[in-house]
Design a protein with these regions (language model features):
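Aromatic-rich peripheral "rim/lid" segments of glycoside hydrolase catalytic domains that contact
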Residues: 314-328
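Extended ligand-binding clefts on enzyme/binding-domain cores
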Residues: 36-37, 51-57, 79-267, 274-282, ...
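Alpha-helical scaffold elements that line and support the substrate/ligand-binding pocket
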Residues: 5, 63-71, 130-138
């Protein structure tokens, strides 16, 4: 839902944005109780919640999309977008662990949590880190926390440095706030899997919006493309250990456990070309351009994740994923 809001505001589709927002507040957002202000992370199309709990990256995108909506359309057309963004931030930052619910930004580490509760608040997810979003909040959220959000942006960039393997450019799905592996011996956690695909695209976004960490980001972009290229630009798979070795266990997507040359990773590795300085970056863009969004050989089709990452990558590479400044 929060991805849909971001896409709608980027394409100046207020009609779609408002319909999505109203549906989300009706069926997904908690209006009272310990989770007030947060959104259930998954719902059926009839509004039934698959889970009550939030996923912190959802709130990250909700807030940023609402601020952009405020900048683009103002706040007097039926929805006060800025007030809604501030409400999410205020509701979150007022939480203190009561009923096991926490802010979605860990206030000690100034880093986003995996889930804003007592368990999920102990660690983070590299793919949730979009430092440029905090810069947007610092500039336009008007919630009295501008300095805090700027520090969150800096901490997030520092954290990413620690989370990326120095040779392969790969990162784990989840890790500790200091960038170290969880070491939990579970299939999801220490390896580069589905969540991790988003990291190249997110770092490219920070590069293109802020240029606050330019040299490291260029090195990172070259590094991860070099690794994937070494695996075969048409054959690299979607799950690796962070050192580039083959995973012992394959995470299931669809009915079959299979390593695939997934469109989602084809897309985000192409988006990384925004910050790359080597010639092979053009090949990654060409591969995305010519890739088809269709079922894999085993019949699995991912409309949601592959589809949205493909769209976001095209938005990045075409110059249509931008900071939206206030209308004058």
């Amino acid at each position: 839902m929060s991805y849909g809001l971001m896409i709608a505001v980027q394409f100046d589709r207020q009609d779609i944005f408002d319909r999505l927002w109203r549906w989300g507040t009706k069926y997904m957002q908690h209006q009272e109780g310990p989770l007030k202000g947060y959104f259930a992370w998954s719902c059926k199309t009839d509004g039934t919640r698959n889970s009550q709990g939030p996923a912190s990256d959802g709130e990250l995108y909700y807030v940023t999309a609402l601020i952009f909506a405020s900048n683009r359309w103002g706040n007097d057309t039926g929805i006060n977008y800025l007030a809604e963004a501030q409400n999410i931030l205020n509701c979150s930052m007022e939480k203190d662990g009561t009923n096991r619910v926490m802010p979605f930004i860990n206030v000690e580490h100034k880093l986003i949590t995996f889930v804003p509760d007592i368990h999920g608040g102990r660690f983070t997810d590299p793919s949730y880190h979009v430092p440029a979003f905090y810069e947007v909040w610092a500039r336009w959220a008007n919630d009295g926390r501008a300095d805090f959000w700027r520090e969150c942006a800096e901490r997030s960039r520092e954290y990413l440095h620690k989370s990326i393997h120095p040779v392969t450019g790969l990162n784990p799905d989840y890790n500790n706030y200091d960038g170290s592996l969880l070491g939990n011996n579970r299939i999801i956690g220490d390896a580069f899997r589905f969540d991790s695909w988003r990291v190249p695209m997110n770092i490219a976004l920070d590069y293109s919006w802020t240029c606050a960490d330019k040299e490291w980001q260029q090195e990172y972009g070259n590094k991860i493309q070099d690794f994937l290229y070494s695996q075969g630009i048409d054959t690299f798979v979607d799950q690796y250990n962070v050192d580039g070795t083959q995973v012992k266990d394959t995470l299931r997507a669809g009915e079959h456990k299979a390593l695939r040359h997934s469109l989602g990773l084809v897309a985000t590795s192409a988006a990384a070309s925004l910050m790359c300085t080597h010639e092979k970056s053009r090949e990654f863009v060409d591969k995305l351009w010519n890739a088809k969004h269709e079922p894999y050989e085993d019949g699995y089709f991912d409309a949601y994740y592959d589809g949205l990452l493909r769209l976001f990558a095209f938005m990045h590479l075409s110059g249509n994923y931008r900071i939206i400044f206030p209308e004058k």
